[in-house]
């Protein structure tokens, strides 16, 4: 496989074929919590993409100099430093969104996607491939968040990115918002539906029966 094809596979593979949420079922907790609005879903997706990509890059660059006995500590230190930078930038330039995301930006430190890619991929792969892998997994994570956020905000509040799309009865319109979709459990069911749809069209992702 040529370098260009391999880079493309690393970048696009996690979006559908190896999606971190839909196939690997990682990072679900934040997906439940931040998808009631598209705005927060988008910002969370961008934050995780940035942290995953740059943590992969930095860890890959020093992978041959990290003692095996302390590799997890080194990985978490790099990831935590990047999360602090992202959190401070959000507080400085998008304070209201930062308040809405609350602790979930900080919890990127413990996100299974970030830690998993650092340990399983960046520690064994050159920097550029690791960087693209981080972006690809961030895009895969973001695709699920945006799909869930789209449904939850549109039918739960009648809006997208805070702009009214479905005119609500309370404002003299026709649409009665479904408040259930604004509750975290609804995201769990929507993610389940997305997994079902993906595995229906890609049966190779269905787990083999024991």
Curated annotation (Swiss-Prot):
GO terms for biological process: sodium ion transport. Signal peptide: none annotated. It is a multi-pass membrane protein. It catalyses: a ubiquinone + n Na(+)(in) + NADH + H(+) = a ubiquinol + n Na(+)(out) + NAD(+). Its main location: membrane. Its EC number is 7.2.1.1. Keywords: Cell inner membrane, Cell membrane, Ion transport, Membrane, NAD, Sodium, Sodium transport, Translocase, Transmembrane, Transmembrane helix, Transport, Ubiquinone. The chain crosses the membrane at residues 14-34, 42-62, 72-92, 103-123, 131-151, 178-198. It is found in: Cell inner membrane. Pfam families: Rnf-Nqr. One of its GO terms (cellular component) is plasma membrane. One of its GO terms (molecular function) is oxidoreductase activity, acting on NAD(P)H, quinone or similar compound as acceptor. PANTHER family: ELECTRON TRANSPORT COMPLEX PROTEIN RNFE, NA(+)-TRANSLOCATING NADH-QUINONE REDUCTASE SUBUNIT D. Composed of six subunits; NqrA, NqrB, NqrC, NqrD, NqrE and NqrF. Belongs to the NqrDE/RnfAE family. NQR complex catalyzes the reduction of ubiquinone-1 to ubiquinol by two successive reactions, coupled with the transport of Na(+) ions from the cytoplasm to the periplasm. NqrA to NqrE are probably involved in the second step, the conversion of ubisemiquinone to ubiquinol. This is Na(+)-translocating NADH-quinone reductase subunit D. The gene is nqrD.
């Amino acid at each position: 496989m040529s370098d260009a094809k391999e880079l493309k596979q690393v970048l696009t593979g996690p979006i559908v074929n190896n999606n971190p949420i839909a196939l690997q079922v990682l990072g679900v907790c934040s997906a439940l919590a931040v998808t009631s609005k598209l705005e927060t879903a988008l910002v969370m997706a961008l934050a995780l993409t940035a942290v995953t990509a740059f943590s992969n890059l930095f860890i890959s660059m020093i992978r041959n100099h990290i003692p095996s006995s302390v590799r997890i500590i080194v990985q978490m230190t790099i990831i935590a430093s990047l999360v602090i930078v992202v959190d401070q930038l959000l507080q400085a330039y998008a304070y209201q969104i930062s308040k809405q995301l609350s602790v979930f930006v900080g919890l990127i430190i413990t996100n299974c996607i970030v830690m998993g890619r650092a340990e399983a991929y960046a520690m064994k792969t050159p920097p550029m491939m690791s960087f693209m892998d981080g972006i690809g997994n961030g895009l895969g994570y973001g695709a699920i968040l945006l799909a869930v956020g789209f449904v939850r905000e549109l039918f739960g509040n009648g809006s997208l990115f805070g702009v009214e799309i479905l005119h609500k009865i309370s404002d003299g319109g026709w649409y009665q918002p479904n408040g259930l979709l604004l509750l975290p459990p609804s995201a769990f069911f929507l993610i389940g539906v997305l997994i079902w749809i993906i595995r229906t069209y890609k049966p190779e992702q269905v787990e083999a029966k024991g």
